[in-house]
Amino acid sequence: MRQGIHPDYHKVIFLDTTTNFKFLSGSTKTSSETMEWEDGNEYPVIRLDVSSDSHPFYTGRQKFAAADGRVERFNKKFGLKSNNN
């Protein structure tokens, strides 16, 4: 690798501010705020609005829209019967 062209890659703590869920990962982002991790070391903290701990898709609280709405509308418009009936 060429020297001096790659960003500094280091461990950081990502903190979901909604649920206070924390995880340690590698990143090129940095922060002046630090926090002590479970291993006793201090790492920079990156605050997140949404993570896998609070996103509706991953938590199972997602609401699904009716997927067959367009098909039903087309069939109704052209007087076709639905296959479901």
From Swiss-Prot:
Matches recorded under InterPro entries: Ribosomal_bL28/bL31-like_sf, Ribosomal_bL31, Ribosomal_bL31_B, Ribosomal_bL31_sf
Keyword hit for Oxidoreductase: no
Record's keyword terms, sorted: Ribonucleoprotein, Ribosomal protein
GO CC terms, sorted: ribonucleoprotein complex; ribosome
Any Pfam family: Ribosomal_L31
Keyword Ribosomal protein applies: yes
Biological process (GO), any one: translation
Molecular function terms from GO: structural constituent of ribosome
Subunit structure: Part of the 50S ribosomal subunit.
Family that this chain belongs to: Belongs to the bacterial ribosomal protein bL31 family. Type B subfamily.
HAMAP family assigned to the protein according to its UniProt record, in alphabetical order: Ribosomal_bL31_2 (MF_00502)
Name used for this protein in its record: Large ribosomal subunit protein bL31B
Protein source organism: Staphylococcus haemolyticus (strain JCSC1435)
Gene that produces this protein: rpmE2
